[in-house]
Swiss-Prot record:
Listed GO MF terms: 1,4-alpha-glucan branching enzyme activity; cation binding; hydrolase activity, hydrolyzing O-glycosyl compounds
UniProt record, GO biological process: glycogen biosynthetic process
Enzyme class: transferase
EC number annotated for this UniProt entry: 2.4.1.18
Phylogenetic lineage: Bacteria, Pseudomonadati, Pseudomonadota, Alphaproteobacteria, Hyphomicrobiales
Protein name: 1,4-alpha-glucan branching enzyme GlgB
Amino acid sequence: MTVPPGKDPAPAPPGMLPAPEIAAILSGTHSNPFAVLGVHAAGKTYVARCFVPGAETVIAETLSGKELGTLERRDEAGFFEGPVALRKEQPIRYRARNDGGEWTVIDPYSFGPVLGPMDDYYIREGSHLRLFDKMGAHPIRHDGAEGFHFAVWAPNARRVSVVGSFNDWDGRRHVMRLRVDTGIWEIFIPGVPVGTPYKYEIVDSNGTLLPLKADPFARRSELRPDTASMTADEIAQNWEDEAHRRHWAEIDPRRQPISIYEVHAASWQRRDNGDMLTWDELAERLIPYCVDMGFTHIEFLPISEYPYDPSWGYQTTGLYAPTARFGEPEGFARFVNGCHKVGIGVILDWVPAHFPTDEHGLRWFDGTALYEHADPRQGFHPDWNTAIYNFGRQEVVAFLVNNALYWAEKFHVDGLRVDAVASMLYLDYSRKHGEWVPNEYGGNENLEAVRFLQTMNTRIYGIHQGVLTIAEESTSWPKVSHPVHAGGLGFGFKWNMGFMHDTLQYLSREPVHRKFHHNDMTFGLLYAFSENFVLPLSHDEVVHGKGSLIAKMAGDDWQKFANLRAYYGFMWGYPGKKLLFMGQEFAQWREWSEDRGLDWNLLEYNLHEGMRRLVRDLNGTYRSKPALHARDCEGDGFEWLIADDRENSVFAWLRKAPGEKLVAVVTNFTPVYREHYDIPLPVAGRWKEVLNTDAEIYGGSGKGNGGAVHAEKRANGETIATITLPPLATLMLEQD
């Protein structure tokens, strides 16, 4: 209906909607469509109103098909209203018709809200711990109809609509209801099937239509380059992992063997045509491989949905959605279940520090800096050109904390390795003077991020016993892996970046120069027990021109392999949990790239297959000898035997655990074959050589001690074993 300029519209008949309100519905500018659309009382009768574009006639019916009345078309664009034979407000449907045929539309505006006052209360308080069941898109049965409930936080928006193929991406069709107290918009849309792409159409407070937004809580997404969210069923996995989860819930992980295989799921292996494997294909190949290799856990680089392959998943736009690259979310649940059935844990890299600025993502979500800081000195990360979460907003903290809980509950993951913690903790991280905003005390500590991390860890450990949190924290921030009640951040473990840096620097030097850098290998023991450490040889060390681990080693090819074998033995004997990035277990020469599989053909060569066997046997030895793992995080599990033999670049120490056999670890980091080398041992008698990285089966020269050494008490009271030290090798000797 149009009104001539200068004239007021004709008044609507009693019970009928005024023309300006109809125009507002048709233009998508009505402030509250739920107040006018659907079924409403009109005196002692009821009237129904609907917007059905393309319809010429509309008949209102009950959900069971009983006719309630024919509605009048008030506007040719498809606005209908009229009296209906009802005694109360209830859900109804419409039978619409035009020259092309007939179709049925269930009226979303005839349904009441789904969220309740208790949801509002906990959301306002910031303490809602099941947002993942309330926000986003969930299949429900509501007032007799099947459909999807949508809910999204956009407190500063003038309008939010759900758009998708079910409404021809028309933002006027499913405008959501605003819950004013929380800023959450919601709507129940009947008849939307599983697997339907959708987004949110948002009009900001100034009336500007924003780029379509993906659902922050979406549990499934389209495959890139498409960016829509997708409706998804709840995960219906038949979990068979009770024994696995009970084990980790009942033990102290610091005293368990933990050897982690770090994997980029898109490039571990590929199909012959170069395509990525699905979760089911990965399960068939990766799980048996890890069992054979003796790893206790698989840690995946981020698998949350991300648009840009070279980001490796660290710039995620869908924290709640397993990436579509490997199939549906149920495939990941099956993968985790398969791991747990054979005793393998699954850890996810998790990125709560920052998010990309893709227009369909979180940045300026409702036309304001909602998830990020408005001030670029706080809200923009100069290293990665990404936005930084505003940890001072309780809604943002709840979004992130709930995401951590979501992966633990819905997918049974065993741990989260939190990425880029240092960038969260320091307000001046990668910033020059004047480019950052001090905290309330004038310091550079991000106190809001500290509180977030403490809250996240407290919630995870409080609700999901047995789930680990691991910090990638590259500075000396104190008490990262100490309990929150003791002033710590509350993580279970922390990556030991210092160990990785110092030892790789040492191994890159020619052996003749190593005596001048002996402290690179001993310094770490000064702080080795200040945190619960994981020793990480991660993906970060084999990219961006750094070369693979084998390429970093000094010397010719024989020395490179011997150096790396000795280094692995050194590391597996060193206190701390272990982490090794894929491909390094067989000494891949090429630097890792995310767009191709590993060079598995190298296993046809003895040196590479020998390296793989060594890592397998190191894992087996580490897991079977409590002395090597039961006191990884406690100083009483380590004792130096030889710490100062700079001239020979020899290191030796004792690993021990209460009531268990002692293990001595001896490393020779020169290519010199040393006979008659004396090492002190605490107990006289026979010590078995349980591992020798120079063994021929590993590609070494086969030098050693014939399977055992003997320690004797000498006249001066010392107990000494005279042993043979193979060149560039590590020995492990167990008290017999």
